[in-house]
Amino acid sequence: MDLLVDADILACQFAYAYEARRGGGGTRAIVDADMMDPEAQDDWLRTDGRWAIAGFDSAVERMLRETRTDKAILCFTGSENFRYAILPTYKANRRGQPRPVLLDALIDHAQQAWECRSEDSLEADDVMGIMATKSPRRYVMASTDKDLKQVPGVHYNWRTGCM
C-alpha cells in the first residue's frame, strides 16, 4: 500500500510551528510572507528554517513507518479552486491571515524531495479522495481533516497515530 498525505495541512503545521518557535507564537508573531521580498525569505530559510524542513521530512518518514506503507505521495491543492466560484464566502474566515514565511519553501522542498500530486481546481483532500476511491485497497489516507473521513478506506491521523 501507498500513503497519501494531505501535505497542505502538514506544510502549514510546520510553517506555523517555525513561526511560533521563531518569536512568540500566535498569529500576531507571524511575519506575512506575501509582504516580504524573496531574498528576505531565503535569508530566513538559510538561518534557522532548516529544522522545519527536516521536521517535515521526518514526519513523512514516521508516517510511512507507522502505517507500514511502501511510499508516500504528497497531495497539494491545485490552482483555481472551483469552490470559490460557487460560494464566494468559501473559507472567508481565513482571508487576511498572514502567510507563514516558510510555507512556500516547505512546499517547494516537498515537490523536489517527494512524489507529489495536485490537480487544478481541487484541494489536496479532494485529490486524495479521488485516488483512494479509484483504488481503495492501494492507499492509506493520512490527514487530520475530518471531512476526509467520508471517503471509504484506510485512514491515518498523524496527530493521534491512529489508523
PLM region spans:
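Noncatalytic, basic helical substrate-engagement surface that gates or grips nucleic-acid strands
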Residues: 2-142, 153-157, 161-162
